[in-house]
Amino acid sequence: MTQSPAKKSFFNRNVDLMNGPIFKSLFIFMLPILVSCLFQQLYNTVDTMIVGNVLGDTALAAIGACGAIYELLVGFGIGIGNGLAIVAARAYGAGDDDQLKQTVAGSIVIGIIASAVITLAGAAGLHPLLELLDTPAEILEDAYGYIIIIDFGVIVMFAYNLCAGLLRAIGNSFMPLVFLILSSVLNVILDLWFIAALGMGVAGAGVATVISQGVSVALCILYVFRSARLLLPEKKHFHVESRLYWELFSQSISMGLMSSIVSAGSVVLQYGINGLGTLVIAGHTAARKLFAFTDMPLTAMASACSTYVSQNYGANHPDRVRRGMRDIYLYGVVVAVTAILLMSMGAEWMVKLVSGSSEPVVLENGARYLVWNAPFYAVLGMLLSTRYALQSMGEKVLPLLSSVIEFLGKIVFVLLFIPRFEYNAVILCEPVIWCFMTIELLIAYRHNSFVFPKMKK
């Protein structure tokens, strides 16, 4: 059964990624994802301001102390959800309604099991892990109180990301944006209520996060019942089909592990940076906050690429995959040129704006980080989109290998180069690693027998 384009309305804006102009469709599909990234970053800033201004530095430090653990939990959960959504997008592209509903049913089952395992492991190991990370005694209990609430809310976080991923899988990137905005606004309101009015402290921030995502899950499910019934499985679709369940499990674990390894690499690099002094850390922190905004066009397009390639892989359109990837690579070059111009004109001013510092060391190091990184945005865009494309076509090991390269590369820089070349080595660490990762991924892409069938042996 072939999927017909969905009738468009204000709340049902499915983008057809399998027919018509390629880049136009990709760009339209990507825009809500880009706004979602921007909104999430702005929300994170507001959330930090609320905790810092109402509860003070100690509470802010408590949340910061478990930041790496939070990223691991969230990254792994999002990775699992994205992996499951990739399989759903393939079924949608193939026009197989039954397969799509079986995929949704299997995703629900695997998601519940994975969430239970993560929650139980967290309940047993989070406190010892915080102690292992040498969390200061004065903030240890607050940090644990926050992260354990997040841990018990993993099932809600997973459901939230799975719902958004499944809607994107059928070409709807608009409604996930709506749900994200609602969740973020509600989270800010609940933060103020729980923290300022009820005096719940750091735990209030965790409860606010879980409740706001829970409300968004409920709204998303209601939307699916009303406007996206294609995603509603019936009882018969919960029958376990070993091949499908293995595909769902392996795809989700591959992406979950990839996110976790990337987060672990960031922790390793931060260890190297922490030995360079307070002013260097301040400059790097400001530069990374700016980087988080400037690389959004690349991460958003990579996310759109995942759905695009998955659908066209399912629809058996290798030519559209090739042409789409070419357009995405060119888009990355445009982003890089824009970043070079932007950083060459105002990098130091932007670092000063974000950091509020007038220290030359802070401003010079932060600006140098931005200027040196900008030309490599084209490489980063190629890396992200190629990795997502390979995962979308069923490749699991090779994209994961790229994350291992990143992790090992950061260990090498921390041990060998940062002690000798200090912050210059920090700046060059990721661009150099991006180049090695991209080479590995492009070789894998060029040898993919679906995209380049002539190379199939």
Predicted segment positions?
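Short alpha-helical transmembrane segments in multi-pass integral membrane proteins
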Residues: M1-M30, A88-I155, A197-I253, V309-F376, ...
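Residue-level signal for short hydrophobic patches within transmembrane helices
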Residues: N19, F23-L42, V46, I69-F76, ...
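Short runs within selected transmembrane alpha-helices of multi-pass transporters and secretion channels
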Residues: G81, I150-R168, P176-S184, A205-A218, ...
